[in-house]
Amino acid sequence: MAAPVLFHHPSSLEHDPGPHPEQPARIVAIERALEERGWLGFERRLSPPATRVQLEAVHPARLINGVQELCASGGGAIDGDTVVSPGSWEAALHGAGGAVAVVDTLVGMPGAVDPARLAVSVHRPPGHHAEARRSMGFCLFNNVAVAARHARDAHGVRRVLILDWDVHHGNGTQDVFWEDAGVLFCSIHQWPLYPGTGAAGETGAGAGAGYTVNLPVPPGSGDDVFGSLVEHVVVPAARAYDPELILVSAGFDAHLDDPLADGRVTDAGFATMAASVRAVADALRVPVGVVLEGGYDLGALSRGLVASLEVLAAEGPVAAPELDVHPLSERYRAQHAALLG
């Protein structure tokens, strides 16, 4: 099996929102932690910038042009949480481009003798709050949505599973694929919390009805809750949906050390969720792409990502974790019975 691939780019350090939790030091901390571990065997590549065609498959030209013009004018605030600097344009282009490169690496080489089964994009700013027509929540473009749409448009992938375990609901990703059965979007997030979306009853509409799976959890939820929801709700949903590609919107702000929420997930908890993902991906014989989202305690962020990637990149089979079924898992399994079969 080919070595896993990690996409990054120095432009991530040039996005400068000023005094802000989403800071360049996030990337510095991650790369230092990975370097200390020999990059976990990942082959490192520089991310290309996303093209206009790739961005416009998700976002209208008006939004893209607005971000570009604000950056070119010296920067400023899009909203109270979302601030750009002159360097933010290149950072955003390469962030979306890194996610696209993940897809190209995993599914873009038909007939390859030894394709990669794991690729990760380590970029900032994050993307999962960016809706089709609105940048928000620290996010300019929705990187994982651009990647999923690229997988389908450029490579003919019919079904993509996106698992978002950031502590904040991925409202932007939900918005993009709300009426689309070609993407199964599963989000585990604290409720109530910013951005205020992601109620359990939000399940998609039209052709996408039933293909949005929101799994809100109360403040104080830890390894048992998050792990059970992945293993006992997301994994059965994946088996029923039978995706050709799994993408993880990997935020690490559900960690017990993170200052922006009230999660209690530990490093081991992220590793457990990753083990569930790896086990079902192996069973379905599909590749896994990881796209960085949030995480604002530098130590928790870097440790959580390293713990997840160690499991996902492990040689040999990874056993599914043996976890008790949490009451929330039972409730959500009943709610999504039509999807789970």
What are these regions (language model features)?
Residues 1-57:
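N-terminal low-complexity, Ser/Thr- and acidic-residue-enriched intrinsically disordered segments
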Residues 11, 35, 60, 104, ...:
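Residue-level marker of positions within ordered structural domains that often coincide
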Residues 48-72:
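Charged, often glycine-rich, active-site loop that binds/positions anionic groups
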Residues 34-38, 62, 155, 263:
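Short glycine-centered helix-capping/turn motifs at secondary-structure transition points
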Residues 2-7, 15, 66-341:
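A general "terminal functional-core" signal
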